[in-house]
Amino acid sequence: MTEQTQDENKLIAERRAKLDHVRASCPANGHPNNFDRKHKAADIQAEYGQYSKEELEEMNVQRSIAGRIMAKRGPFLVIQDVSGRIQAYAGKDVQKDLKAKYQGLDIGDIIGVTGQLHLSGKGDLYVNMEEYQLLTKALRPLPEKFHGLTDQETRYRQRYVDLIVNEESRAAFIMRSKVVTAIRNFMVSKEFMEVETPMMHSIPGGASARPFITHHNALDIEMYLRIAPELYLKRLVVGGFERVFEINRNFRNEGLSPRHNPEFTMMEFYMAYADYKDLMDLTEEMLSSIAKDLLGDTKLPYGEHTIDFGGPYERLSMLDAIKKYNPDNETIQSMTYEEVKDVEFMRNLAKSLGMTIEKFWTCGQLLEEIFGETAEPKLMQPTFITGYPADISPLARRNDENHFITDRFEFFIGGREVANGFSELNDAEDQDKRFKAQVDAKDAGDDEAMFYDADYITALEHGLPPTAGQGIGIDRLVMLFTNTHTIRDVILFPAMRPQG
């Protein structure tokens, strides 16, 4: 047992003894639930922060606050609630029995205080502790003072402590909530209907990813946590709901990284009688609007960069982006789509760039990997990348002028993908062929290839109107709005390996 652990155990024992003492005299067994908190710290600061000491004395303002003790300095307590902090004061005029109980209060305890509002000599508002009640005794001490946790892993494992002591973490998750609300309000304003589709699928689909597998006991079948809601949302468009969206979780049984968590949040939407260009226009409008609403500006800092959501955003084909960011590579500069269709040419190009390739990769996969290796990290400003090959876009409509590519884009900011959208493939026969090609790819060793979904083909045979659809990664978008660089900082409880 370390010295630090011994000290912590001693503090816990002392706090338990204090709780036992409180329980002996408290009818609620030390955990009362009858305190009426009427006021929040931030509201008090906003309403009375401009008054002088003498003015407050004359006004005789009575306030009732509750929150967690974050500091104890002599007769002063710093109390934190969801809105902010305010002080409480156990001065000379506090009753003797309350004064005695005050000595038993510890940092971390949750208390309720009622009394007159005053201004200290330093200019801080405080509530005189004319009445107070211990509401919850904290048995474990908070980290030293309240400067925050220094160990990142502990912050993720004990998010509740992180939120107590780190204002930055609280602000990030408040911003996350605001971003989600702003997106929802924007979509509703554009006449989209919010829907909910299954989280468990009998056939995984809608994206190229490895699913989580579970078992349904009553039906005695394997089921899959959804990797995307796409195929169900498009079934709804077939059914006549022309504009639908869903904000919910997806699950992909893949690795962890600063950009990836196996459980993540997406906003996916579909609109009939639209194409992928309409989606790009809508995305520009949405992000510009959200930035203005939440930040008051379309520009926001991100690391060493300033991201400008004002638009218009750059639009490049994948092939042109590779050329733009490899200006000194003569082979790339002269590359045409005919060469991109040559798998041996693409393999040799990838190898010349020092890349490790898989034997089952198609021409389209090789092009995407080269893009990801040489161009994607350089896309700091909002950028739409179009011209995705059909063999890596099994659900997207083929381009009318070049059947090798599709009417698809991915949207990048800060060197990472944030959204993916395309004109939907509504040709049931073409979709049937592409599903079969995905099955062949899976048989060849690609465990991220899609399954064949016969019911979805049946839905398409009933007729899907011309439709465009898009998915936006909420977590990655929030990373931009909070200037954070790992997805774990914007997910309240990220996936972690169990301890011990």
UniProtKB/Swiss-Prot annotation:
Mg(2+) 2 binds at residue 417. One of its GO terms (molecular function) is ATP binding. Its cofactor is Mg(2+). Keywords: Aminoacyl-tRNA synthetase, ATP-binding, Cytoplasm, Ligase, Magnesium, Metal-binding, Nucleotide-binding, Protein biosynthesis. One of its GO terms (cellular component) is cytosol. It is found in: Cytoplasm. InterPro entries: Aa-tRNA-synt_II, aa-tRNA-synth_II, aa-tRNA-synth_II/BPL/LPL, Lys-tRNA-ligase_II, Lys-tRNA-ligase_II_N, Lys-tRNA-synth_II_C, NA-bd_OB-fold, NA-bd_OB_tRNA. It is an enzyme of class 6 (ligase). Mg(2+) 1 binds at residues 410, 417. Disulfide bonds: none annotated. This is Lysine--tRNA ligase.
